[in-house]
């Protein structure tokens, strides 16, 4: 952090008192005003004072230890004037919450010193996905003659299972759902910032020569050691296959197959930077389903965004459907002034979500009725054909909500793998983008907690037909999951 002179002094505080759920966070702030690192840490404390999932997957004692470890690491990074160390300290701390929506969001950083961390020439020059603790090459994007389906055994002398174990503690996810974390640590050309690239570049970069020494075993069993030049952010983005989130171009595809089944592929639902009329496009194609044998919806690479699946559900139901098996909880009635001063959001009403909330005890409140998830109303137009959805561990936000509603409707069969998200509890719905003024790092703070009704497993949603990814599928002329879903729709299974 060459433009800032970090000060590492910080007065001690009682962490148990800080995190006590019944104490207003605003009463515990401003420990030593005017010291920059203190201000950053006070803002983090204020955020944790209202975080809806702080105690969902950890005890107050564990939360206390986690915050203490973060403070120590952040102060150490400050003393070294180490931006990477500060970013890693915050990232590691936020993952201890086991909340898939709490992280130092790569896409929301606007500080030049922070974004510089993400652009370096440290990336592996191929795409891959994790199958358990195995790293499987899926595409040779840089022309190194790597065979898809090859298994990477070592990177720069380190076993890939050990590399995965080193990166998982920095990777967001809900509860114990490591399937989501492995999905985020796969590189498939879907994101402008890949989670693996960020943390591998900071934790396990190539040597000074810029080469990755990779040991691979090809599908035919032949083992080879390759020296591959690392690539930078620009090169990674040049190989992306996902349509940009901006502009008015269609983001999804619709294919009418020879067997009479229509395939709707939806790789993303984040529409806030797009001028595309996605709803009109979707409604027009749903109107064309008269006489179709079935509809297959592929959302396997789609984390979420807007509630773009609602128009589909609306055509499948006869009465309003919430499809959301969670109760909404808040941990504040009044937004701390420090967070108001050091955050932004797209909807200013989020700062007042706690007004009129009903106390539940234990530092939690039930929000007003207008804050709770809205039901989906049935549409006048119907989908009469069978409907299947292809799901997987990437689904954890709006797509997790869609899959819950799809299952609740009783009209959609789910194919694929267990989703991301968590049936016990997730957080989201409304966010603050919190900016730490001294380091310049931003992190996302969800405001609504969603708690499962009754005892729920600490995992995502399981499919009706389980079809885990098989490396043997790479290079196959047809996608086996799509074919299985289409066969079910057409009555051929």
Q: Predicted segment positions?
A:
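Alpha-helix-centered segments that form part of catalytic cores
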Residues: 194-197, 204-208, 354-385
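A hydrophobic, small-residue-rich beta->alpha segment in the mid-to-C-terminal subdomain
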Residues: 460-468, 472
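Flexible, low-complexity junctional segments that flank or bridge functional domains
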Residues: 5, 12, 17-19, 25-329, ...
């Amino acid at each position: 952090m060459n433009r800032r002179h970090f000060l590492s002094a910080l007065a001690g505080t009682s962490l148990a008192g800080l995190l006590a759920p019944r104490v207003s966070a605003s009463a515990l702030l401003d420990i030593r005003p005017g010291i920059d690192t203190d201000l950053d840490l006070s803002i983090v404390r204020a955020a944790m004072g209202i975080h809806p999932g702080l105690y969902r997957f950890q005890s107050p004692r564990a939360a206390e230890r986690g915050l203490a470890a973060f403070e120590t690491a952040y102060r150490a990074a400050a003393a070294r004037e180490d931006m990477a160390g500060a970013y890693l300290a915050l990232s590691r701390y936020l993952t201890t919450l086991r909340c898939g929506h709490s992280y130092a969001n790569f896409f929301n950083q606007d500080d030049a010193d922070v974004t510089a961390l993400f652009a370096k020439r440290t990336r592996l020059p191929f795409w891959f996905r994790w199958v358990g603790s195995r790293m499987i090459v899926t595409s040779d994007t840089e022309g190194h003659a790597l065979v898809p389906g090859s298994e990477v055994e070592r990177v720069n002398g380190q076993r890939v299972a050990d590399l995965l174990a080193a990166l998982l503690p920095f990777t967001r996810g809900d509860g114990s759902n490591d399937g989501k974390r492995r999905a985020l640590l796969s590189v498939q050309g879907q994101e402008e910032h890949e989670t693996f690239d960020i943390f591998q570049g900071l934790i396990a970069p190539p040597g000074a020569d810029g080469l990755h020494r990779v040991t691979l075993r090809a599908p035919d069993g032949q083992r080879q050691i390759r020296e591959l030049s690392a690539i930078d952010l620009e090169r990674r983005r040049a190989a992306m296959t996902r349509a940009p989130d901006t502009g008015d171009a269609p983001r999804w595809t619709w294919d009418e197959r020879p067997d009479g089944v229509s395939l709707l592929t939806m790789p993303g639902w984040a529409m806030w930077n797009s001028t595309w009329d996605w709803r009109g496009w979707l409604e027009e194609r749903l109107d064309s389903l008269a006489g179709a044998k079935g509809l297959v919806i592929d959302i396997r690479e789609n984390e979420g965004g807007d509630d773009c699946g609602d128009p589909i559900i609306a055509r499948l139901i006869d009465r309003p459907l919430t499809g959301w098996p969670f109760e909404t909880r808040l941990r504040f009635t009044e937004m701390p002034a420090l967070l108001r001063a050091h955050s932004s959001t797209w909807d200013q009403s989020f700062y007042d979500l706690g007004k009129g909330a009903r106390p539940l005890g234990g530092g939690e409140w039930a929000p007003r009725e207008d804050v709770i998830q809205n039901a989906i109303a049935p549409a006048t137009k119907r989908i009469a054909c069978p409907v299947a959805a292809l799901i997987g561990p990437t689904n954890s936000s709006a797509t997790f909500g869609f899959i819950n509603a799809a299952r609740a409707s009783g009209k959609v069969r789910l194919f694929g793998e267990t989703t991301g998200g968590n049936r016990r509890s997730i957080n989201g719905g409304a966010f603050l983008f919190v900016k730490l003024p001294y380091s310049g790092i931003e992190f996302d703070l969800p405001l609504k907690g969603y708690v499962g009704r009754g005892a729920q497993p600490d995992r995502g949603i399981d499919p009706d037909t389980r079809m885990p990814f098989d490396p043997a599928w790479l290079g196959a002329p047809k996608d086996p999951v799509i074919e299985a879903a289409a066969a079910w729709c057409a009555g051929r299974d």
